[in-house]
Regions:
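N-terminal helix-forming leader/targeting segments
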Residues: 279-284
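Generic short N-terminal amphipathic or hydrophobic helices
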Residues: 206, 270, 276-277, 300-301
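Catalytic domains of riboflavin
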Residues: 1-250, 256
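Short, intrinsically disordered low-complexity segments enriched in Ser/Thr with adjacent Pro
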Residues: 278, 290, 298-305
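Hydrophobic, low-acid, alpha-helix-prone terminal segments
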Residues: 255-275, 287-295
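Short, intrinsically disordered/low-complexity patches at protein termini
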Residues: 55, 225, 293-295, 302
């Protein structure tokens, strides 16, 4: 049996991210698996707006892990959720806040109905901090801004999927455990998914998908200037939305029609030094070769790749 499991091609059981997003959009529960060198676990996930008592009960009965609510930093801030620990020393840096309960509409708070109601209140745009209390039986997790491109965890992945599906950016997640209490790995997760008619996706595939399709740079400032080296340029400052870093680019107006391309520039002197915008440029000799290459090849753009 072990040899059969080792030879089985589990990649055939993995669904493309587009299918996982479609499952989420239609309110169906799915499974996401993280990397083997990380937690190497699979989580049951459903967009928070579809978390009915039946779905919560399924997670408690079949998932057996901790049922958590993944939310954005903005939502956690609006609900005034304090972090569970002042210093997060957990190995994966999972961002737990204090546990919560709906202020009204619950009894003991632990039933599937009560937890589903608490989740509904926590993601309701009309509700505020006064509508929840702590401690409770729902455990919020705060997703990092930038999602899986910043942290490759189930928290970020579940919020990313909800957002890609055009839904409220929150999700209910629960680790999947085996009958004996051990964590389910991919072979067991495939069996679990087949038994319950679910699709499995991977966080690695989600990261790859976002890298292919997302736009990370936003245009901040543009201005035209004359270069002492020759010609007119248009300088643009871009901001990386993932880490906030700014990058410079300059387009040579006169070579624009010759050949469209990008010449990366990594010297700390910056774009203005390269093009000798500042008089008596002390760095000019260091830029002689890349600058020559820029004009001789007809490249239209020089970018600060620092």
């Amino acid at each position: 049996m072990k040899d059969h499991i080792e030879k089985y091609d589990f990649s055939a059981a993995i669904s493309p991210i587009e299918e996982i997003v479609e499952e989420a959009r239609n309110g169906r529960m799915y499974i996401l698996v993280d990397a083997e060198d990380r937690e190497n676990e699979g989580d049951l996930i459903i967009p928070a707006q579809f978390a009915t008592p039946a779905q919560v009960n399924f997670m408690a009965k079949h998932g057996r892990g901790l049922i958590c609510l993944a939310v954005t930093r903005d939502r956690a801030k609006l609900l005034e959720l304090d972090m569970m620990a002042r210093e997060n020393r957990e190995s994966m840096k999972t961002a737990f806040t204090v546990s919560i309960e709906a202020k009204e509409g619950v009894t003991t708070g632990i039933s599937a109905h009560d937890r589903a109601h608490t989740i509904a209140v926590a993601i309701d745009p009309t509700k505020v901090a006064d509508d929840i209390v702590s401690p409770g039986h729902v455990f919020p997790l705060v997703a990092r801004e930038g999602g899986v491109l910043v942290r490759a965890g189930h928290t970020e992945a579940s919020v990313d999927i909800s957002r890609l599906a055009g839904l409220y950016p929150a999700a209910v997640i629960c680790e999947i455990m085996n009958d004996d209490g051990s964590m389910a790995r991919l072979p067991e997760l495939v069996t679990f998914a087949q038994l319950h008619g679910m699709k499995i996706g991977t966080i690695a595939d989600l990261i790859a998908w976002r890298r292919r399709h997302d736009r990370f740079l936003e245009r901040r400032i543009e201005s035209d200037f004359e270069s002492a080296w020759g010609g007119k340029f248009r300088a643009t400052v871009f901001r990386n939305t993932l880490d906030g870093a700014e990058h410079d680019a300059a387009r040579h107006q006169e070579t624009r029609e010759r050949r469209d391309g990008v010449q990366p520039h990594q010297d700390r002197g910056g774009i203005h030094d390269l093009l000798e915008v500042v008089e008596h440029d002390q760095h000019a000799p260091a830029f002689e070769r890349p600058r020559d290459a820029l004009f001789e090849s007809g490249f239209a753009v020089v970018a600060d790749a620092e």
